[in-house]
């Protein structure tokens, strides 16, 4: 079955909205250190991913103003993987904080939405490499029937523009 790049992109955002956790790091900083972050979206806008963090975290300290960043995502079922590139910046817009605020975020910030440690990160997406991991049982059956796994795999990966 052929999967188009647009279908892979749709699957990525559906999985990311469901699973919400990815590894985020700054390109060229701290030997590529990444840390788990909870991704949030402003409705159906898939051009930007938002993250709440504290100003005293290593990521926030290394960020400075705006920095190229990379995120790694693996769906809970390990049926989809992605590497996402973009620009990360601090954006403590009160309206966006209010829109994205929830009880899970509130648990981390005793001072609420105006906690002095609160930092909202904005990840403006540029591109992604997406891999779809076919069911191993199905892949095994296809190989037994003479299917070329490299040919089948070619339809399960794509590099897509996200901006």
Summary of predicted features, one role per range:
Residues 37-42, 75-77:
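Short, charge-patterned binding micro-sites
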Residues 14-29, 69-73:
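A short, Trp-centered hydrophobic/proline-enriched beta-strand micro-motif
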Residues 52-54:
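Short His-Asn-centered micro-motif
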Residues 58-125:
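Short, structured beta-strand-loop surface elements
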Residues 116-163:
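C-terminal edge-of-domain segments
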Residues 30-38:
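A positional/architectural concept
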Residues 45-50:
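Short active-site oxyanion
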Residues 1-21, 157-163:
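N-terminal leader/targeting segments and the immediate start of mature chains
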């Amino acid at each position: 079955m052929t999967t188009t790049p647009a279908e892979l992109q749709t699957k990525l955002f559906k999985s990311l909205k469901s699973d919400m956790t990815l590894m985020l790091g700054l390109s060229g900083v701290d030997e590529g250190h990444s840390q788990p972050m909870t991704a949030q979206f402003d409705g159906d806008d898939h051009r930007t991913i938002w993250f709440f963090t504290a100003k005293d975290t290593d990521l926030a300290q290394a960020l400075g103003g705006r920095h190229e960043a990379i995120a790694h995502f693996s769906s809970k079922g390990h049926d989809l993987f992605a590497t996402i590139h973009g620009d990360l910046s601090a954006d403590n817009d009160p309206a966006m904080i209010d829109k994205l605020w929830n009880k899970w975020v509130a648990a981390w910030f005793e001072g609420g939405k105006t906690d002095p440690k609160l930092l909202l990160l904005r990840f403006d997406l540029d591109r992604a490499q997406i891999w779809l991991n076919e069911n191993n049982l199905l892949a095994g059956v296809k190989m037994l029937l003479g299917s070329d796994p490299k040919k089948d795999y070619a339809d399960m990966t794509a590099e897509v523009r996200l901006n």
